[in-house]
Amino acid sequence: MDFSKDIILDNVSYTYAKKTPFEFKALNNTSLKFKKNKVTCVIGTTGSGKSTMIQLTNGLIITETGQTIVGDYAIPANIKKIKEVKRLRKEIGLVFQFPEYQLFQETIEKDIAFGPVNLGENKQEAYKKVPELLKLVQLPEDYVKRSPFELSGGQKRRVALAGIIAMDGNTLVLDEPTGGLDPKGEEDFINLFERLNKEYKKRIIMVTHNMDQVLRIADEVIVMHEGKVIDIGSPFEIFSNIELLTKIEIDPPKLYQLMYKLKNKGIDLLNKNIRTIEEFASELAKVLK
């Protein structure tokens, strides 16, 4: 069974608090694909269905219609029990918005090794990997015996992320992974996600409200609105579509905000696929010659 191929959500739906006065349709018969080895960012306003959608990917919740297909494994609608749930959750690691609240062991070593050991990995082998995982998330290797509760919020988040990476799955699903971090923490995490994708060939699925991060890291952007996918494209295709951004009430990245202002002054760089300040400076210099 191969979980590394495309993840397909086929005509999926999900309703919270069904048959109560608080009933809310979070997903409404929508479909999409997360491609192998790609970085996909999911954007949309609060309540658009982003977080619900990513929880379908590893069976945390089950669709009410259609099916979830992970590689060559299908999870039909309304199924009561997923047969391959342990392997599915090993291969697709879901990192919640504040993963540091998931820490519970008395040492960092035990916390990071908990997932692999729980899924059947030899305990000694799992513990042996911990120093290298700490190094990967930019924490000192000698932290292994420390309590996670002695760490700062940002450090706890690094430990929690190391615990997900320890399971060595092919996919990381990240729900607002840099929320609440300082600028250096944000930069470190985005650098790590880029490295995990490029060097370790991990598929990254990231829900975020930070459009600057989307512009930097995404191969593809999925736009959610009122429980449906309303657009899919490259960062260039999405952020150069001002009508779309207005509809979903999302401001473009700062670089695109600057380019929109320049367009109003008669300098149009929006037809260029610009992703960095260096590319922007180069294209602007050509226009001003």
UniProtKB/Swiss-Prot annotation:
The keyword Zinc does not apply. It is a peripheral membrane protein. Keywords: ATP-binding, Cell membrane, Membrane, Nucleotide-binding, Translocase, Transport. NCBIfam families: ECF_ATPase_2. Forms a stable energy-coupling factor (ECF) transporter complex composed of 2 membrane-embedded substrate-binding proteins (S component), 2 ATP-binding proteins (A component) and 2 transmembrane proteins (T component). ATP-binding (A) component of a common energy-coupling factor (ECF) ABC-transporter complex. Unlike classic ABC transporters this ECF transporter provides the energy necessary to transport a number of different substrates. Belongs to the ABC transporter superfamily. Energy-coupling factor EcfA family. This is Energy-coupling factor transporter ATP-binding protein EcfA2. It comes from Mycoplasma capricolum subsp. capricolum (strain California kid / ATCC 27343 / NCTC 10154).
